[in-house]
Amino acid sequence: MADAAVELPGRLAILPFRNKVLLPGAIVRIRCTNPSSVKLVEQELWQREEKGLIGVLPVHDSEAAGSLLSPGVGSDSGEGGSKAPGGSAGESTKQDTKNGKETIHWHSRGVAARALHLSRGVEKPSGRVTYIVVLEGLCRFSVQELSARGSYHVARVSRLDMTKTELEHAEQDPDLIALSRQFKATAMELISVLEQKQKTVGRTKVLLETVPVYRLADIFVASFEISFEEQLSMLDSVDLKVRLSKATELVDRHLQSILVAEKITQKVEGQLSKSQKEFLLRQQMRAIKEELGDNDDDEDDVAALERKMQNAGMPANIWKHAQRELRRLRKMQPQQPGYSSSRTYLELLAELPWQKVSEERELDLRAAKESLDRDHYGLTKVKQRIIEYLAVRKLKPDARGPVLCFVGPPGVGKTSLASSIAKALNRKFIRISLGGVKDEADIRGHRRTYIGSMPGRLIDGLKRVSVSNPVMLLDEIDKTGSDVRGDPASALLEVLDPEQNKTFNDHYLNVPFDLSKVIFVATANRMQPIPPPLLDRMEVIELPGYTPEEKLKIAMKHLIPRVLEQHGLSSTYLQIPEAMVRLIIERYTREAGVRNLERNLAALARAAAVKVAEQDSVLRLGKEIQPITTTLLDSRLADGGEVEMEVIPMGQDISNTYENPSPMIVDEAMLEKVLGPPRFDDSEAADRVASPGVSVGLVWTSFGGEVQFVEATAMVGKGDLHLTGQLGDVIKESAQLALTWVRARAADLNLSPTSDINLLESRDIHIHFPAGAVPKDGPSAGVTLVTSLVSLFSHRKVRADTAMTGEMTLRGLVLPVGGVKDKVLAAHRYGIKRVILPERNMKDLAEVPAPILSGLEILLVKRIEEVLDHAFEGGCPLRPHSKL
């Protein structure tokens, strides 16, 4: 208990309390674990036979409250210390942050305390020493100077509380006597109320009758749960009259809170019956609102929702619809089944961006072009079309631009191009994945009559981005399906039609929403699965696969830096030379895009990361890490008003890095060790075309161009044609056409009927397309099928360095096909040197990079006879044939 006769020494060791105040007369228990606090307790309390006094000084999280002191760190003699302004307790200064130390806001006033109990312990297995100290507050003091002594602080202090003689003289003051009576009366009333609930208040009643009132003010307030600012206010109240006045106010407030709680409890219990027990919590809430003078049960939720809807900026007709729904919601109880669904619907109306848009900055086409060139290598025509699109937007911002649909194999940058458009327009970007969507409700939403109904993906996406004019990417639009639940592609017709999407009607929303401000961009791997009406609403931009040189540039400029960053590495740890990247492209990846290339680079980075992480030598990033010299305290309230404070150190971030004397350079040995033996080699075609009946074709798939081998054989049978390899109807018809043409021209092809294989009699033909798990279809394998059959029947091998593509007619004409660029790139990837193409596809060769064309021999043909002449070594002599 506070003692007016305590002799206060000139200097006190300071124990900081964070966001908590020890008042005179109060008793607290603290647990000291921090090294600086442990050092203070050992030197000032544990090692001394006569336990001295220590100072408890509050520490602020910020300088906003109370009187602050700026400590300096100096010697015990005061050098470098920080002096408090004399007599100006309300002034404050702020400690400068040096060497990254945290600013400490010390309060300028504290309480001298003595240890009533002290115990020492050792934690296992760490062996850390801890102390539990029970402290009693004695008297207030003011800090004149604060300095450091080793790892803790000491302060030069002066007493603030009155001495015994001064107190005896002050007790004769009539105003103080009146305040004392008022405080005791309020405190006694509080004790009377608490006696009905607690049996331990008897001791408090004895204290009230025996202890001087100036001591009771601090003791009573210390037992209440009050804010840190109010605790500081009591600590700063040196004048007895001010202290008693504040204490009386706090005691009275505590009393009133207890009385109000009792009143609410009595009112609720009086209204409850056995059938109403389940509404206990709701009755209590209603009673609390009545005490506050607020009888509107929906003010906190429904009224707030209404204000949010008013600020949403929805059109007048939709606002009327929302008001009707809101009135319906007000009439419902929260327990009713439709309450939650109705509320969720109104929240959606309030959150939709009816008027909110992204502010477009003035388009800078030069900057947009530089950004596209920086983020995407190659794709010259595609980037030029995007620049044209942006130029039109600049000249006519309200123009209805076309819906761009990027079609190309995976990994060529379709999604990132859409993101670049959003970046150039300064609009928000959202991606809607349509892969595997088979339900029309995913686009239009579910009707609200269904349980668990929700809006469609478009409306939900607009709610998430919170603007009505984003760039919306409809990803994998060719992967949608249809079943009994509807066709999502048909629902997209309204979305992508500029004449209709201004009044798009989502089934869940049930009111029109304007989608005309949205810029739609779609991506697909193939055009064929997209329904023609939907395809007609989009402008298709084809993205071909990358050439090996383009892949090399992309890897060196984009992929390798990104992979190293993702794995916590840099060029000082791992270096991948261009030659090794080229080997990865040629031997480990054969794709149109660069995803597999990135995966292989990531495998190399992971292998390097293991080597780096296994190193034993560790270097600190910070070479001079300062010791923690100041401790903040984390406090919490315990039962009975007792405070237990856990001493913890301030947070300090100390980072480590790994020492790597020399970078790891990837070579062929490391490639084989990490990636395994090469998956592809240039001799694959030669090995597979080693016998008659095998030819090399070129096909286009959703993954880009590919090399397709065709194998044929014959056996005794009934003249049937067998086809295997998961083939579609078109390619089956091409095989039938090829066999018919070969049989019809057998004599011209010098295929003797007396040979081991007679084309005109009982022989079955089996044609197989390897990679049987991959579906295949299309007419471009016609010339390849004819070449394979002629090779089979003539016992001549097809040239292994030659690949071909083209549709043929029954009269032997070779018709043009699509995907020429991708097919030529595929031939180049496989090491093919000669490519046979329809002559009418010559215009498509302009899209093939010149370095690729220079390494290939392109053979343009009009008829199938020319194909056969180029496909066999030494040509294929034909007899004159009819021109019919």
From Swiss-Prot:
Tissue expression from the record: Expressed in roots, leaves and panicles.
The organism's place on the tree of life at top rank: Eukaryota
GO cellular component labels: peroxisomal matrix
Motif (Microbody targeting signal): 882-884
Record's keyword annotation contains Signal: no
Residues annotated as catalytic: S780, K823
Single GO biological process annotation from the record: lateral root development
Domain called Lon proteolytic: residue spans: 689-874
Gene3D superfamilies: 1.10.8.60, 1.20.5.5270, 1.20.58.1480, 3.30.230.10, LON domain-like (2.30.130.40), P-loop containing nucleotide triphosphate hydrolases (3.40.50.300)
Ranges of compositional bias, category Gly residues: 75-89
Lon N-terminal domain location: 12-255
Record-listed E.C. numbers: 3.4.21.53
Positions contributing to ATP binding: G408, P409, P410, G411, V412, G413, K414, T415
Catalysed transformations (reactions): Hydrolysis of proteins in presence of ATP
Compartments reported by the entry: Peroxisome matrix
Molecular functions (GO terms): ATP binding; ATP hydrolysis activity; ATP-dependent peptidase activity; serine-type endopeptidase activity
Keyword Protease: yes
Region entry Disordered, spans: 67-101
Record's keyword terms, sorted: ATP-binding, Hydrolase, Nucleotide-binding, Peroxisome, Protease, Serine protease
Biological role stated in the UniProt entry: ATP-dependent serine protease that mediates the selective degradation of misfolded and unassembled polypeptides in the peroxisomal matrix. Necessary for type 2 peroxisome targeting signal (PTS2)-containing protein processing and facilitates peroxisome matrix protein import.
Homology family: Belongs to the peptidase S16 family.
Protein name: Lon protease homolog 2, peroxisomal
Provenance organism: Oryza sativa subsp. indica
Gene: LON1
